[in-house]
Amino acid sequence: MAVGNGVLLHIAASLMLFFHVQKLVQYLWMNSRRHRLPPGPIGWPVLGALRLLGTMPHVALANMAKKYGPVMYLKVGSCGLAVASTPEAAKAFLKTLDMNFSNRPPNAGATHLAYNAQDMVFADYGPRWKLLRKLSNIHILGGKALQGWEEVRKKELGYMLYAMAESGRHGQPVVVSEMLTYAMANMLGQVMLSKRVFGSQGSESNEFKDMVVELMTVAGYFNIGDFIPSIAWMDLQGIQGGMKRLHKKFDALLTRLLEEHTASAHERKGSPDFLDFVVANGDNSEGERLQTVNIKALLLNMFTAGTDTSSSVIEWALAELLKNPIILRRAQEEMDGVIGRDRRFLEADISKLPYLQAICKEAFRKHPSTPLNLPRIASQACEVNGHYIPKGTRLSVNIWAIGRDPSVWENPNEFNPDRFLERKNAKIDPRGNDFELIPFGAGRRICAGTRLGILLVEYILGTLVHSFVWELPSSVIELNMDESFGLALQKAVPLAAMVTPRLPLHIYSP
């Protein structure tokens, strides 16, 4: 039966009305959501808030939070960025909504440094990440695995003590970060590859240290191309070019180490190392299998995060002790009472030294190795503290700001280990469950090396404090405590100090 023109016009008009009403409802709904976005600063055209971050983004964001509150929303380029600046805000994102923020956003560091996100740090939360994490926990980073290579840590630290004692004997200052990088890289080399990466502390180990510092610095930059992908190819800041050049250096080093490891396989019969375990168990029930590129990327994670993050906290802690000699003497008195002065500091001593543990917690609080957590991204739209967070929003947790929150910490800019001996703070732990102190992050993507990081800081710092008298060189009038921003928070001026053995000299023999 034919349909009249009037009926067709009526149907068309109804469809048009429905379409416009639908669009209006959608607009009003979206507009109401926008009004519920967290507060934040108004940025510049195109760049958004990028220019507001400056050279010290963690400080700039902490200052913004004083005005806009614990959860902020910034438009950075074409991307939304949510920033959590208090323990409660961090808990909302990293615990309550942990699964929704378990992935990383695309970024130049993952692409150009981490073999296109083939590593454990930047990989999506999925089968490959789970396999890398599992192997790392079982064979190097978990509690049982750490016990298995305790003797390696003791031996390599012995080499470092000898080198430091020799420097002291010759009246030469010790550059703390160089010594720490040398020792930690060799610790990891022994357990991962069955070899010391550096035969002695010198130009080769210092070059490696410089490479690690450069990687942690450039990886922490707010790269314009990450936030305005359409112009990433222009590399306006030169960051991507620097990453590519640095990647070539690391890849050459890792390729050489892998080739040497393969050539020496016959020497490890019956004594497999971490890399042997990874190669032998590089697949899982979900069909994921590790390739050479994944192994290189994993080794890169271990050698960079495993050396730089812990060494920076130890360096900051020693600097604070030199500025606060009363705290240094009290720590040494505690150790002398428990350990004495006729043997070396051992890992088993740590649990008997509450003041040392408090010093380490205070260093984690005031000088977190990672001031802004590695970014995450919202898989779905969600709500936090009554605020709407759109899908695809990047998340930054300001760990530095949380550690200096005056509503949580009394006199937060003061280095005061006693705060962790007080009843209300005594049980606060840096392992990711107490959001007042999360130097390693929290949730599913918490740093895989949390146990190792805490152990190295406590063990190495305790050993250095127990083993030496520490003084600043006579040429240093006032210790520089300025920060240098990056993925890891470095001292702007590396700490150099004069050391004198305070134990019998035979203890320093390697």
UniProtKB/Swiss-Prot annotation:
Q: Quick one: which residues bind heme?
A: 447
Identify the coding gene. Answer: CYP75A7
**Keyword annotations from UniProtKB, A to Z:** Heme, Iron, Metal-binding, Monooxygenase, NADP, Oxidoreductase
Q: What does this protein do?
A: Catalyzes the 3'5'-hydroxylation of naringenin and eriodictyol to form 5,7,3,'4',5'-pentahydroxyflavanone and 3',5'-hydroxylation of dihydrokaempferol and dihydroquercetin to form dihydromyricetin.
Recorded source organism is Eustoma exaltatum subsp. russellianum
Kindly tell me the pathway this chain contributes to.
Pigment biosynthesis; anthocyanin biosynthesis
Q: Name one GO molecular function term.
A: iron ion binding
Q: Which catalytic reaction applies to this protein?
A: a 3',5'-unsubstituted flavanone + 2 reduced [NADPH--hemoprotein reductase] + 2 O2 = a 3',5'-dihydroxyflavanone + 2 oxidized [NADPH--hemoprotein reductase] + 2 H2O + 2 H(+)
The coenzyme or cofactor needed here is: heme
**Which GO biological process annotations does it have?**
anthocyanin-containing compound biosynthetic process
Q: What is its EC number?
A: 1.14.14.81
- Enzyme class, one word? oxidoreductase
- Mention any Pfam family matching this sequence: p450
Q: Which family does it belong to?
A: Belongs to the cytochrome P450 family.
Annotated protein name in UniProt: Flavonoid 3',5'-hydroxylase
Domain of life per record? Eukaryota
